[in-house]
């Protein structure tokens, strides 16, 4: 059976502006905030968004491919996977934004057999080539509604 792929951006998907504002206020008040997981003292994810992502992977068996700047060549994919409690199967060549990211995803799909895929990325520019397979959290990051759409697409139940 051909694998399905979830192309994962992190910033804007597993965190968003309002999350960073809330985290910043917690840090100013020197309070820990269990709503967030901090990666190497600078980056973070929102725990409820991370749980939604983990459920997508569990329910679909998809392989996670990094497209975020978190996956640049200087960072260890296994370490990021451990932090997210997910297996990261790889990353595209260009983990910066813009058309380079889009072209890297297209190249990956051309070079790897697949049944279904989802591009989970808040970047709008260029990703229109993926049609319905581009799930674009706009302001709130990953939501339950977007999670269900990802699951349906990855299972081939939404075309």
Task: Tell what function each PLM region has.
Residues 3-96:
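Alpha-helical substrate-recognition element adjacent to the catalytic core
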Residues 75-159:
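C-terminal cap/substrate-recognition subdomain and adjoining C-terminal extension
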Residues 1-2, 57-60, 110-113, 129:
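Flexible, charged surface loops at secondary-structure boundaries
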Residues 1-4, 159:
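Classical N-terminal secretory signal peptides
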């Amino acid at each position: 059976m051909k694998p399905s792929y979830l192309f994962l951006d992190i910033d804007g998907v597993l965190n968003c502006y309002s999350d960073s504002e809330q985290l910043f206020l917690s840090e100013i008040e020197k309070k820990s905030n269990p709503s967030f997981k901090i990666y190497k003292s600078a980056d973070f994810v929102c725990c409820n968004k991370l749980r939604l992502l983990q459920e997508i992977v569990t329910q679909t068996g998809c392989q996670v491919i990094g497209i975020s700047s978190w996956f640049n060549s200087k960072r260890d994919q296994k370490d990021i996977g451990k932090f997210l409690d997910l297996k990261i199967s790889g990353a595209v060549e260009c983990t910066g934004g813009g058309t380079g990211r889009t072209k890297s995803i297209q190249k990956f799909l051309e070079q790897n057999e697949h049944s279904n895929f989802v591009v989970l990325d808040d970047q709008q520019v260029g990703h229109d080539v993926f049609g319905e397979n581009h799930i674009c959290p706009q302001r709130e990051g990953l939501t339950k509604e977007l999670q269900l759409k990802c699951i349906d697409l990855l299972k081939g139940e939404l075309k």
